[in-house]
Amino acid sequence: MPTHLVWFRRDLRLQDNLALAAACRDASARVLALYISTPAQWQAHDMAPRQAAFISAQLNALQTALAEKGIPLLFHEVADFNASIETVKNVCRQHDVSHLFYNYQYEFNERQRDAAVEKTLPSVICEGFDDSVILAPGAVMTGNHEMYKVFTPFKNAWLKRLKEDIPPCVPAPKIRVSGALSTPLTPVSLNYPQQAFDAALFPVEENAVIAQLRQFCAQGADEYALRRDFPAVDGTSRLSASLATGGLSPRQCLHRLLAEQPQALDGGPGSVWLNELIWREFYRHLMTWYPALCKHQPFIRWTKRVAWQENPHYFQAWQKGETGYPIVDAAMRQLNATGWMHNRLRMITASFLVKDLLIDWRLGERYFMSQLIDGDLAANNGGWQWAASTGTDAAPYFRIFNPTTQGERFDRDGEFIRQWLPALRDIPGKAIHEPWRWAEKAGVVLDYPRPIVEHKQARIATLSAYEAARKGA
């Protein structure tokens, strides 16, 4: 009887899990599951404590779900990816594993680890799957067989390729012939700092996540284009955390969207949310093609020469939400308190750090990863490089958000700002976007800082720094 081992990583679900489905295809095989915790590696990768708590909860739910299918979950903890190579080898030897199944991860360290694992298992048949994307890296290329560097042509080619053959979702495995496990389960515990998260916003149980997806696609996807930019409105899917840890697959998102919004592939209702899924694909494909992106390197080489300011005071003010710009500060306090931030606010806060404070985007990238429950290297790096004008198809360097104008445009009446900045709750109407002006006129002393920089002057300094770097190219 063959023994099949499924190595779980960022794919913590039963439904539409390509590696798990392949491992369970042979009804006569004994199927085991493996998860390896690597705290030192996670620390090096700046994994957020809230994401660790989310993964821990998902693992325990996964262990229960697997047990009901008759599949035991083997849990091991080692320091880092290098140590995990030997762990996989030992598990395969101890359990006489004939086949190893896993879903690809596209980050540089993860790819090195997987290649090393396969080299240490010459007698084991290893099968990997492109599970975390809808179309595999390399499936969408230019006429010169190169990776697209601009999103819109990539999107058009991606949609054309998708329409030719939409990848199906695979069902959860059936219960094994041996039946469900009867032995009591030992709870999985991660030796990593953890912080509580809101399980109502970020459900753990697989069925609850699918219900969240169904509700959004049925009731929110068609109006997503109109509502997505306003942080006071519940207009986004909140599925990013489940996508980041693999509690949900992008194929599940695609199929549910098309079931509810069948015109999404042709620019109809739901197409704007589909665009966000394609951006996710774009950044993953880029990371596979350009591994330097995993090493904190800018895509546009001349931006390496930008003379960033080293100003710990400014950086800490940004981290704490004490910059004096209400929309920026409210957004950062939302991030610190919940581990999540609205996407429009991610753009605003990133732009402010880089182009108002002239602080290296990589510091912001790392801080976001250390806080985000939906931390994902490809998406986070892509977003930061877009905001910093260092990435492929990024905002041009001279595009600099005015933080006050952004607040007026996307939180006009200050509803979101008042939620997160209690010191400003009594400021009437639109005056909340420039509280220092209102305070001066009203003769009031606010428990809130004045702006740490003047935007117009900061804009001039940033343009000068970028232009100097570009001319040195």
Curated annotation (Swiss-Prot):
One function term, GO molecular function aspect: FAD binding
InterPro entries named among the record's database cross-references: Crypto/Photolyase_FAD-like_sf (IPR036134), Crypto/Photolyase_N_sf (IPR036155), Cryptochr/Photolyase_FAD-bd (IPR005101), Cryptochrome/DNA_photolyase_1 (IPR002081), DNA_photolyase_1_CS_C (IPR018394), DNA_photolyase_N (IPR006050), Rossmann-like_a/b/a_fold (IPR014729)
Cofactor binding annotation: Binds 1 FAD per subunit.
Chemical reaction(s) catalysed: cyclobutadipyrimidine (in DNA) = 2 pyrimidine residues (in DNA)
Binding locations of DNA: 228, 406
Residues flagged as site, Electron transfer via tryptophanyl radical: 308, 361, 384
GO biological process: DNA repair; response to light stimulus
Cofactor field: FAD; (6R)-5,10-methylene-5,6,7,8-tetrahydrofolate
Binding site for (6R)-5,10-methylene-5,6,7,8-tetrahydrofolate: 109-110
Residue numbers spanned by region Interaction with DNA: 276-283, 343-344
Disulfide pairings: none
Domain Photolyase/cryptochrome alpha/beta: 2-134
SUPFAM superfamilies attached to this UniProt entry: Cryptochrome/photolyase FAD-binding domain, Cryptochrome/photolyase, N-terminal domain
Binding site for FAD: 224, 236-240, 374-376
Signal peptide positions on this chain: none
Coiled coil: none
EC number(s) per entry: 4.1.99.3
Keyword list, A-Z: Chromophore, DNA damage, DNA repair, DNA-binding, FAD, Flavoprotein, Lyase, Nucleotide-binding
A Pfam family it matches: DNA_photolyase
Complexes and interactors: Monomer.
Function: Involved in repair of UV radiation-induced DNA damage. Catalyzes the light-dependent monomerization (300-600 nm) of cyclobutyl pyrimidine dimers (in cis-syn configuration), which are formed between adjacent bases on the same DNA strand upon exposure to ultraviolet radiation.
Membership in a protein family: Belongs to the DNA photolyase class-1 family.
Protein's recorded name: Deoxyribodipyrimidine photo-lyase
Source organism per UniProt: Salmonella typhimurium (strain LT2 / SGSC1412 / ATCC 700720)
Originating gene: phrB
